[in-house]
């Protein structure tokens, strides 16, 4: 993600966290059938996965495998009519489970072929399946809903979710915007494949993740079908729609590139769009193979949003991007999208990597070297008294997770590590990191372990200074 200001203040408090943890504890208490110890032990899935920054996010008891989302949307009325079919596998015997959903009114909900009881409690959609679900059972949840999806406003006044534009909608999801329009298990750790079937007035273009399977027009309405074949976290899903100029090309190595640009931004965006193939080729040479079956970008006019987001396969931009911003968001396809955080406090692994990738791209194209950028007044050249040095890189807190520290100090950490272990070990490390955790999740602890393994060095003191301590590092 790139932004002109810090995003996403805390949405939690001690009471909320305690309540979530208590509910999770209660949910794990199950009773066996009397006199039959081998019988299923039905219980409610946990209503939270316990992330310290966003304790309401995610749910336990099942693993989502696929989302199939069918919807119609009219930009004139801002009304969505949608049906989402979730395919999941129960990871425990379930008599109740939660989904995350803040969207429009639900008109129908089924588990399998059977209507299910449900209630809404804030973000939680609490479902009681009939019959109950056994461990290992594959099941579907079909949710039908209609109305206007909400814009989610964070305490820092940045917005996400379903953001109407003058010709459609801009749809960013990080860190908790997907439930505005998508009933889901909204956690970075529960990745799934996606299919989107979107019907809009003729002349409107819908751009989703993955590849365009079909586009058909009849009776003044056009249906777009997008398929995302590789696993994706919900916050990376998008179905941004509006008036776009579409261009399709390929990189020299054959990666399909699909770009959709608001015609009002074509001239300002031309330089960044033209460099997409070159950026992808360069990053593939140092990070390893591009992890998806399509690349691209969506450049829209959404002035109230004010940031770009690394939506999987096609980053979304709320204004015309610079080449550097384009490089940052494309780097996320490896670091952030394919390899995602284990918990939100690990955000430096996303933003630090993408920022450092931009330093490498700048050097590659004849600009400042990575060392010069490290030394600059925006980075290590900041005064030791700057408040910048008072945020912990590996635990910035929800109020600073999209501030400068995970980005800039995260990138500085990587450059300092490169100097510590040498170029050969460093570039082996970051390529192995992308390969070993492809389509998965990883933590700061995982990265430290990987760095020590590749380098053969004890790096505890190094990472303590750069990741876990406040203050400007003086030596490492």
Model regions and ranges:
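Amphipathic alpha-helical substructures
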Residues: 403-476
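Zinc-dependent metallopeptidase catalytic helix centered on the HExxH motif
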Residues: 313-373
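Short, hydrophobic/aromatic-enriched beta-strand segments in well-ordered soluble domains
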Residues: 84-86, 137-151, 194-202, 224-230
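N-terminal, polar/Ser/Thr-rich
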Residues: 2-17, 27-81, 164-167
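Hydrophobic helix-coil surface modules that form long, contiguous segments used
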Residues: 187-327
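A surface-exposed beta-strand-loop module
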Residues: 101-163
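Surface-exposed beta-strand/loop patches in extracellular or lumenal glycoproteins
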Residues: 81-104, 182-186, 192-201, 445-449
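Glycine/proline-rich low-complexity spacer/linker segments in large multi-domain proteins
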Residues: 135, 145-194
């Amino acid at each position: 993600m790139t932004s002109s200001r810090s995003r996403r203040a805390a949405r939690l408090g001690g009471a909320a966290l305690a309540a979530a943890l208590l509910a999770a504890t209660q949910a794990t208490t199950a009773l066996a059938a009397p006199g039959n110890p081998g019988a299923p032990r039905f219980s409610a899935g946990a209503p939270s996965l316990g992330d310290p920054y966003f304790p309401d996010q995610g749910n336990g008891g099942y693993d989502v495998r696929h989302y199939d989302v069918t919807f119609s949307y009219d930009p004139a009325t801002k009304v969505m009519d949608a049906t989402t079919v979730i395919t999941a596998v129960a990871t425990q015997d379930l008599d109740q489970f939660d989904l995350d959903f803040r969207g429009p009114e639900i008109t129908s909900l089924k588990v399998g072929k059977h209507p299910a009881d449900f209630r809404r409690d804030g973000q939680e959609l609490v479902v009681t399946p009939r019959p109950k679900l056994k461990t290992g059972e594959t099941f579907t949840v079909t949710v039908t809903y209609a109305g206007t999806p909400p814009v989610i406003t964070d305490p820092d006044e940045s917005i996400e979710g379903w953001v109407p534009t003058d010709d459609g909608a801009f749809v960013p999801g990080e860190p908790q915007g997907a439930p505005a329009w998508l009933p889901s298990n909204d956690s970075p750790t529960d990745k799934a494949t996606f299919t989107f079937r979107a019907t809009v007035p003729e002349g409107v273009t819908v751009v989703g993740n993955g590849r365009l399977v079909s586009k058909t027009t009849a009776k003044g309405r056009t249906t777009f079908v997008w398929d995302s074949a590789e696993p994706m976290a919900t916050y990376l899903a998008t179905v941004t729609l509006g008036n776009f100029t579409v261009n399709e090309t390929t990189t020299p190595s054959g990666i399909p590139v699909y770009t959709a640009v608001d015609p009002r931004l074509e001239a300002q965006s031309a330089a960044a769009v033209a460099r997409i193939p070159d950026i992808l080729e360069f990053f593939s040479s140092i990070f390893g193979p591009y992890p998806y079956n399509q690349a691209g970008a969506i450049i829209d006019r959404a002035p109230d949003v004010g940031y770009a987001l690394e939506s999987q396969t096609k980053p979304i931009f709320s204004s015309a991007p610079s080449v550097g911003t384009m490089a940052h968001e494309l780097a996320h396809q490896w670091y952030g999208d394919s390899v995602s955080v284990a918990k939100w406090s690990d955000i430096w692994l996303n933003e630090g990597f993408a920022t450092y990738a931009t330093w490498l791209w700048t050097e590659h194209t004849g600009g400042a070297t990575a060392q010069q950028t490290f030394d600059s007044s925006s980075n290590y050249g900041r005064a030791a008294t700057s408040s910048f040095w008072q945020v912990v890189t590996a635990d910035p807190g929800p109020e600073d997770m999209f501030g400068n520290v995970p980005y800039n100090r995260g990138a500085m950490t990587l450059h300092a590590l490169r100097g510590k272990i040498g170029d050969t070990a460093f570039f082996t490390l970051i390529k192995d990191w992308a390969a070993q955790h492809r389509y998965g999740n990883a933590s700061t602890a995982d990265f430290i372990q990987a760095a020590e393994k590749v380098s053969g060095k004890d790096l505890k003191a190094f990472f303590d200074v750069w990741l876990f301590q406040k203050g400007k590092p003086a030596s490492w």
